[in-house]
C-alpha cells in the first residue's frame, strides 16, 4: 500500500514502491529494454567481428611484407627459417581469427537475431504485443484498488479539513472571550460553530475510517492480482536472461583460442622451428658458400692456340657477353643449394664498359688504365634487385686495382659515394616534377609534384635520369616523372 494510516504512528511508505499506482511501469519498460538489449548485444558482437577481421588482415599483411623482406635480406640459414616461422605463425593465427569472426556473425549474431524475432512481436500501432499485455494486466489488477484509494484520499482530505476548521473555531472563541466588545449573541454563534465543526470532524473521521477499511479489504486481492501479472513478466525476463547467459558462453568458446587444438599446435611448431636454429651450422654453410671454403679456379699456364674461339683468355671471355653475371660456386655439403636471391647479381653492360672492364680486370697492365672504372658503377645499376643485392660486390676476377677490391677501406665502411666523381655529361636542364616520388634506395631522390630540380644526365636504358635537388643532393629518379621547364 502507498500509505498506512495509524492514529498512533502515521508512517508514510516511500512513493517509489511497486505497489503505488502506476509504478508497475518500470516492470513493463523492462520488456522493451529486453528487445533493445538484444540489439545492443548484436551490435557488440558485430563490432568485435569487425575487429577480428581487421586484425586478421593486418596479421596477413604484416606477415607478407616481412616474409619478403627477410627472404630478400641478408639473413640466411636456419636462423632465417626460424625468423620466417614467426610470419607463418601470423598467417595461421590470422586464419583462426577469421574463423572467430565467422563464428560470431554466422552463429552467435544470427542466434540472437532469431530469438529476438521469436520473443518480441511488433504491433501495427507500434510497440510490442508482450509490452501491451503486461500493461493491460497491471492496469486491470490495479483499477479496483486504485478506485478505493482515491476514495480514501478524498475522505482523508475532508477529515483533515474538518479538523482544521474545528481548531480555527476554537481559537476564535478563545480570542472572543478576551474581547469585551463582543455581545453574548456573537459569542453564542462562535460556540455553535465549534459544535458544528466537532460534528463534522466525527462524521468525516467515520467516513475516512470506513474508506480505509474497504481499501484494506481489497488490498489482498489487489496484491494477488499484481503478483500474478508480475510473475508473468518475471518468467519472460528469466527466459531472456538465461538466453543471454547461454549466448555469452558460446561467445566465450569462440573467442578462447587457447582451447583450440590447432592454436596450441601453431606455437608448439613455432617453438620447434626457433629451437632448430643452429648458429654453428649457419656459419659452416656461409664458410662453404661465401668464405674460404669456396672452390677457386686458380690461374694456370695456358698454351697459345691459333683457335681463338677455344683459347679465349679470361679477359676476352668477359667481353663476349652482354652482361656480367656473378654467381656463387656451389660446394658439396648439406646446404649447398641455400644461396639467397642476392647471391647472383646480373649487371648490364655496354661496349664502352666492356673496354673498361677489360683494362680493370687485367692484373698485368698499368694502374693508369683503371682510373675511369669507378664512375662506371652508376651505369650498371639494376633497379629490379633488392637493396641487399645492390649493396653486395663480388669481383669476377682478381685484381690489385683498389677500384675493384670489395675489401677496400672505402667500400668496407659503406662510405663510398657513387656521385663523388664528376659525372656531369651534357647540358644541365631544369625540370619540374609531375608526380610525387619517394626514393626507394639511398641513391634515389625524393620530391613532390611541382618541385624543381636540375637534370645533369640524360635517361639511361633503364629509364632513369640523374639529377640534383636545390639542396645539392644528387641521385637518380624516373625520367617520366618530370618535364622540362620551358
From Swiss-Prot:
Q: Which residues form a coiled coil?
A: 25-274
Q: Tell me where in this chain the SH3 domain is found.
A: 426-486
Instruction: Supply one GO molecular-function term.
Output: phosphatidic acid binding
Q: Specify the superkingdom.
A: Eukaryota
Keyword Membrane applies:
yes
Residues found modified as N6-acetyllysine: 53
Q: In which tissues is it expressed?
A: Widely expressed (at protein level).
Q: Which GO terms describe its biological process?
A: actin cytoskeleton organization; caveola assembly; caveolin-mediated endocytosis; cell migration involved in sprouting angiogenesis; cell projection morphogenesis; modulation of chemical synaptic transmission; negative regulation of endocytosis; plasma membrane tubulation
Q: Where is the composition biased (Polar residues)?
A: 327-362, 384-396, 404-416
Consequence of mutating residue 50 to D? Slight decrease in affinity for membranes. Nearly abolishes membrane tubulation activity
Membrane topology label: Peripheral membrane protein
Q: Which UniProt keywords apply?
A: Acetylation, Cell junction, Cell membrane, Cell projection, Coiled coil, Cytoplasm, Cytoplasmic vesicle, Cytoskeleton, Endocytosis, Endosome, Lipid-binding, Membrane, Phosphoprotein, SH3 domain
The entry's stated outcome for residue 313 to E is: Reduced membrane-binding affinity
Q: Does the keyword Signal apply?
A: no
Query: Which positions carry Phosphoserine?
Result: 273, 313, 373, 399, 446
Q: Which parts of the sequence form the motif NPF3?
A: 417-419
Stated role? Regulates the morphogenesis and endocytosis of caveolae. Lipid-binding protein that is able to promote the tubulation of the phosphatidic acid-containing membranes it preferentially binds. Plays a role in intracellular vesicle-mediated transport. Involved in the endocytosis of cell-surface receptors like the EGF receptor, contributing to its internalization in the absence of EGF stimulus. Essential for endothelial organization in sprouting angiogenesis, modulates CDH5-based junctions.
Entry remark concerning the domains of this protein: The F-BAR domain forms a coiled coil and mediates membrane-binding and membrane tubulation. Autoinhibition of these functions is mediated by an interaction between the SH3 and F-BAR domains. The F-Bar domain also mediates the binding to the cell actin cytoskeleton through the interaction with CAV-1.
Q: How does it assemble?
A: Homodimer. May form heterooligomers with other PACSINs. Interacts (via NPF motifs) with EHD1 (via EH domain). Interacts (via NPF motifs) with EHD2 (via EH domain); this interaction probably stabilizes the caveolae. Interacts with EHD3. Interacts (via the SH3 domain) with MICALL1. Interacts with RAC1. Interacts (via SH3 domain) with DNM1, SYN1, SYNJ1 and WASL. Interacts (via F-BAR domain) with CAV1; this interaction induces membrane tubulation. Interacts with TRPV4. Forms a complex with EHD4 and MICALL1; the complex controls CDH5 trafficking and coordinates angiogenesis.
Specify the protein name.
Protein kinase C and casein kinase substrate in neurons protein 2
Amino acid at each position: 500500500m502507498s500509505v498506512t494510516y495509524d492514529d498512533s504512528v502515521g508512517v508514510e511508505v516511500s512513493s517509489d514502491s511497486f505497489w503505488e499506482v502506476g509504478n508497475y511501469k518500470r516492470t513493463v519498460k523492462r520488456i522493451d529494454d529486453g528487445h533493445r538489449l538484444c540489439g545492443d548485444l548484436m551490435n557488440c558482437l558485430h563490432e568485435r567481428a569487425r575487429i577480428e577481421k581487421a586484425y586478421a588482415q593486418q596479421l596477413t599483411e604484416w606477415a607478407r611484407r616481412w616474409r619478403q623482406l627477410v627472404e630478400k635480406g641478408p639473413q640466411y640459414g636456419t636462423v632465417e627459417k626460424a625468423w620466417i616461422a614467426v610470419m607463418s605463425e601470423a598467417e595461421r593465427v590470422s586464419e583462426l581469427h577469421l574463423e572467430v569472426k565467422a563464428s560470431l556473425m554466422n552463429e552467435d549474431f544470427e542466434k540472437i537475431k532469431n530469438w529476438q524475432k521469436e520473443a518480441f512481436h511488433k504491433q501495427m500501432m507500434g510497440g510490442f504485443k508482450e509490452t501491451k499485455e503486461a500493461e493491460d494486466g497491471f492496469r486491470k489488477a490495479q483499477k479496483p484498488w486504485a478506485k478505493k484509494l482515491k476514495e480514501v484520499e478524498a475522505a482523508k482530505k475532508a477529515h483533515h479539513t474538518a479538523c482544521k476548521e474545528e481548531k480555527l473555531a476554537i481559537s476564535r472563541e478563545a480570542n472572543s472571550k478576551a474581547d469585551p466588545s463582543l455581545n453574548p449573541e456573537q459569542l453564542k454563534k462562535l460556540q455553535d460553530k465549534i459544535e458544528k465543526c466537532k460534528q463534522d470532524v466525527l462524521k468525516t473521521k467515520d467516513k475516512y475510517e470506513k474508506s480505509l477499511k474497504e481499501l484494506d479489504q481489497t488490498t489482498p486481492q489487489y496484491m494477488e492480482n499484481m503478483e500474478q501479472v508480475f510473475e508473468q513478466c518475471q518468467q519472460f525476463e528469466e527466459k531472456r536472461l538465461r538466453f543471454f547467459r547461454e549466448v555469452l558462453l558460446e561467445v566465450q568458446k569462440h573467442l578462447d583460442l587457447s582451447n583450440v587444438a590447432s592454436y596450441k599446435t601453431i606455437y608448439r611448431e613455432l617453438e620447434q622451428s626457433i629451437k632448430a636454429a643452429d648458429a654453428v651450422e649457419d656459419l659452416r654453410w656461409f664458410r662453404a658458400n661465401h668464405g674460404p671454403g669456396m672452390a677457386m679456379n686458380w690461374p694456370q699456364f695456358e698454351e697459345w692456340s691459333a683457335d681463338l674461339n677455344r683459347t679465349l683468355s679470361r679477359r676476352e671471355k668477359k667481353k663476349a657477353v652482354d652482361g656480367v653475371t656473378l654467381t656463387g660456386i656451389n660446394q658439396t655439403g648439406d646446404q649447398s643449394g641455400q644461396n639467397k636471391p642476392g647471391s647472383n647479381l646480373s649487371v648490364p653492360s655496354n661496349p664502352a664498359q666492356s673496354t673498361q672492364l677489360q683494362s680493370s680486370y687485367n692484373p698485368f697492365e698499368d694502374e693508369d688504365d683503371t682510373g675511369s672504372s669507378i664512375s662506371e658503377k652508376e651505369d650498371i645499376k639494376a633497379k629490379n634487385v633488392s637493396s641487399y643485392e645492390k649493396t653486395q660486390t663480388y669481383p669476377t676476377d682478381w685484381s690489385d686495382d683498389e677500384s675493384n677490391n670489395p675489401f677496400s677501406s672505402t667500400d668496407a665502411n659503406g662510405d663510398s659515394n657513387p656521385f663523388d666523381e664528376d659525372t656531369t655529361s651534357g647540358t644541365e636542364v631544369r625540370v619540374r616534377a609531375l608526380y610525387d616520388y619517394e626514393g626507394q634506395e639511398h641513391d634515389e631522390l625524393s620530391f613532390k609534384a611541382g618541385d624543381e630540380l636540375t637534370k645533369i644526365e640524360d635517361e639511361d636504358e633503364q629509364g632513369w635520369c640523374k639529377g640534383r635537388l636545390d639542396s645539392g643532393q644528387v641521385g637518380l629518379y624516373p625520367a617520366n616523372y618530370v618535364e622540362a621547364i620551358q
